[in-house]
């Protein structure tokens, strides 16, 4: 009852980030250390239960504002009284994709059913703020056969007061924390944006409202993730975008009609992402160009197969033995009657049965590997050097026989290939 998570006990190790010893700082634990422990557990549990065809219906990728970008501000309100507020808007997190359907955009926090996104008018009535917009953000949901839910962005200026004083408090801004699963891409990262001395007053005089902070002129200021006591004046524009949700499965397997609908109706996918990530070519009338899409996807599959494999990768061949198990949507275990007795259980592609190596080894060594900059993981991922020193990369593992995307991973450049699946003999 209640899903797999209720049957899991967390036994944290003292002295670690999620079980800190005194006098370590723990003020952000509820929205950061807790979430960075809890949400990856969803993916672990999902991979554990995928082999069961009934239980896989409960699989859900990471979402729900996987790292909360807090905006804390204070000052004197429109009535001359002191005020303080924590912007609660990121509670409208994105729900991750499922094994058989898309995630839910701004669906709330997946760990609780009682999330309520604040009403903008009520916030403006209570505090000295004027919202320029609050919107769901295109491309913020992780790409996949089933797309992750979109997150949102809130943008405001002071109103009825000369200035307000801010603190930022966040993580998850350099690399995605809402990772996808079984070939799905991650969702957007947290993003703080701040335009000093903008032309927002001139825009108001022309009866113009910006649809995005990028349309506002001014001087861009990069905010730190623990920046304290910075002032926002009436001409300064502030926005915060929170994490999107992870996608499920290979984006090239998504129905092109759904991708076209995401572009034209849902405003969930940009034309550029549709082509570059989903391999879908849009026609001038807003529909999918079927022939061009088929040609592009075929080309992308061919390019995937050309990437190098590991030094110890098995010979390129298809297995004809019995299918024993399917641990993920893209990976299965087959018998190889020609192999030595202790090597007969082999990883293979679920589509073409290409041999990916012994189940005693990491299947990723048998895949074609492409290592990309972290910015390739989601269109909203920016320059990591703003926040961290080690270079993160986006690794993709393809079937060398058919080009199917088996899995993605985010790691530091020098990290060994991550082991995400082991079978108990």
Language-model region placement:
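Short, charged low-complexity linear segments at domain edges
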Residues: 310-332, 363-384
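Short, compact, well-ordered microdomains
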Residues: 390-425
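Conserved beta-strand elements of beta-rich interaction domains across eukaryotes
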Residues: 15, 245, 353-354, 413
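Short, flexible, mixed-charge glycine/proline-rich loop motifs
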Residues: 324-348, 386-393
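Short, structured motif recognition centered on aromatic/hydrophobic residues
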Residues: 344-363, 394-398, 406
């Amino acid at each position: 009852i209640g899903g797999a998570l209720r049957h899991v006990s967390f036994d944290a190790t003292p002295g670690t980030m999620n079980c800190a010893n005194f006098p370590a700082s723990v003020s952000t634990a509820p929205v950061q250390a807790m979430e960075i422990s809890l949400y990856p557990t969803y993916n672990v549990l999902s991979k554990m239960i995928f082999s069961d065809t009934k239980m896989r219906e409960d699989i859900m990728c990471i979402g729900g504002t996987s790292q909360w970008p807090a905006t804390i501000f204070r000052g004197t309100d429109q009535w001359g009284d002191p005020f303080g507020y924590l912007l609660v808007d990121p509670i409208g997190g994105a729900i991750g994709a499922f094994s058989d359907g898309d995630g839910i955009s701004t669906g709330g926090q997946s760990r609780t059913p009682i999330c309520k996104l604040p009403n903008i008018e009520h916030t403006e009535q209570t505090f000295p703020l004027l919202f320029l917009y609050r919107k769901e953000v295109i491309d913020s949901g992780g790409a996949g056969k089933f797309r992750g839910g979109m997150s949102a962005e809130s943008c405001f200026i002071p109103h009825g007061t000369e200035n307000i004083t801010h603190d930022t408090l966040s993580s998850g801004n350099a690399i995605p924390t809402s990772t996808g699963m079984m070939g799905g891409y991650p969702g957007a990262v947290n993003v703080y944006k701040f335009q000093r001395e903008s032309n927002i007053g001139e825009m108001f005089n022309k009866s113009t409202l910006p649809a995005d902070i990028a349309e506002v002129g001014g001087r861009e200021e990069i905010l730190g993730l623990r920046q304290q006591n910075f002032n926002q004046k009436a001409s300064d524009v502030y926005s915060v975008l929170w994490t999107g949700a992870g996608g499920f499965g290979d984006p090239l397997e998504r129905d092109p009609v759904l991708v076209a609908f995401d572009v034209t109706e849902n405003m969930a996918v940009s034309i550029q992402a549709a082509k570059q990530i989903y391999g879908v070519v849009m026609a001038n009338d807003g529909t999918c160009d079927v022939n061009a899409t088929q040609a592009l996807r075929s080309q992308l599959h061919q390019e995937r197969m050309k990437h190098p494999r590991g030094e110890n990768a098995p010979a390129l061949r298809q297995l004809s033995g019995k299918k024993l198990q399917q641990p993920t949507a893209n990976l299965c275990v087959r018998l190889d009657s020609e192999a030595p007795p202790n090597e007969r259980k082999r990883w293979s592609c679920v589509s073409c049965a290409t041999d990916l190596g012994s189940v005693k080894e990491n299947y990723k060594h048998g895949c074609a590997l492409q290592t990309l900059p972290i910015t390739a993981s989601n269109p909203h991922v920016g320059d990591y050097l703003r926040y961290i020193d080690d270079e993160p990369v986006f690794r993709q593992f393809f079937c060398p026989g058919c080009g199917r995307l088996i899995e993605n991973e985010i790691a530091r450049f020098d990290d060994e290939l991550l082991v995400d699946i082991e079978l108990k003999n």
